[in-house]
Structures are given as C-alpha cells and as structure tokens.
C-alpha cells in the first residue's frame, strides 16, 4: 500500500493519472481509492486547501451549476455576462468539494461548459459534510461473462458501464443505479429456453450504448467504499470488501 501526494485538483486529474498510466504501461496492476485532500494543523486550527474555480457556461445552465456547487461549500466571487448568452462564474471552494464535480459539470452543461481550477490558499476546514454522488451503483454479484439478455433487463434500472461478452467478477461495478442505493445484479443471466416457441415472443434485444470511463473519469466517479482497478488491459471500478473471484 502506498500514497501519492500533490497539490490541488489539477494534480489529481493530471499528475496522478499520468503516474498511473505510466505504471500501467509498464505492466503493473493496482487499485486506487478515492483521492483525499491533505489537511494541515496551523496554530492549533485544522486547515484544508481551497481552489479558485472559473466556469464559463451558457446562461441557461447557470442556475444548475450554482445549485450543484452550493452543497460542495463553494462561494461565489463574481458573475460576469458577455451579453451573448454565456456567463463567467468565479468561485472559491475547498478542494474536497470539487473532487468528482467535473464529470457532473459536463453532464449539467451537455458538454458545452468550460471549467478551470487552481490552488488558492489553505483555510479553516469548512463545517458540515460535502455533497456526494447522488446515485448508487449496480455491481455484479456473480463472476462470468455478460450477456445481452441480462444487460437488456438491467438497463431499465440505470446506465450501464459495459456491453455484451465482457468478463466480470464479484463486486465489479457494472452501472449507475437510477436510485440512491447500491444494487447487486447478475449481468451474466441467460434466457431460459423452452421447447415451446410462440409467435412474437422472440424480440431483438437493443442495448443502449454504455458509458465508458477514462481513468480520470473513473477516479472522479468513485466514492469512499469503491476502488478503481487498473491493469495493462483494462480500467474497472469495484466495491470495497466484495470477494473478487
């Protein structure tokens, strides 16, 4: 077990991912937990890092972005409109508050938003909990190979992270649950065959395109009880404490 340290969210997204990718290409296999901030004791008071966030979005997305950053302890510093339909927002927020926000930001703005952040200062730790991912995950409760029949039925319960014919193990995260709780599922379940074939019972199974996470996106997605597993051949996410077989 080892720890890698750096400064700011930029480190987490760039330096950490570069380090992991380098190790991956050299043949290493490793599991990475959710990034955490480094707090300091200054004159008997616990301090945490804060970052300056500059966001450029369409005006129609301004409210949703501000609503999402509120529970993350971000404080608005400035709002500036270009009078052409876009607005620039400036915030100061604790670094732990924006871990995992970038992927949500892209979803909120439909990929049209621009966000940059830079370390600003160390300040007193903000009281209260930081907002977490609002949805639970679907994770495999059995090892095997995924089948279209099982995935077709699971896609009604959330968004899938993999397609047909993929090897999975117990505890592997296979999708985002539509509700706030985690859901154990069987993505390897096959259709039971019978000797009777009725007209109209066989249908073509159409799977919704699944979400594929990059390393950076996976690191932002996971929560405290989850890990990103990296091998030379794959990037996967899993629940901690589940038996891997």
What role is predicted for each listed range?
Residues 56-70, 226:
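Phosphate/diphosphate-binding loops
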Residues 35-40, 84, 120-122, 213-214:
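Short acidic loop-to-helix transition motifs that present clustered carboxylates
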Residues 21-23, 47, 92-96, 103-225, ...:
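Long insertion/accessory domains within large nucleic-acid-processing enzymes
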Residues 35-36, 75-84, 191:
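Solvent-exposed beta-strand/loop surfaces of large extracellular or lumenal domains
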Residues 1-11:
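Single conserved hydrophobic/aromatic residue that forms the stacking wall/gate
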Residues 23-31, 69-77, 106-114:
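A common structural junction motif
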Residues 13-16, 58-62, 92-99:
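Helix N-cap motif at beta-to-alpha junctions
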Residues 45-57:
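Short glycine-/aliphatic-rich beta-strand segments at the starts of folded cytosolic domains
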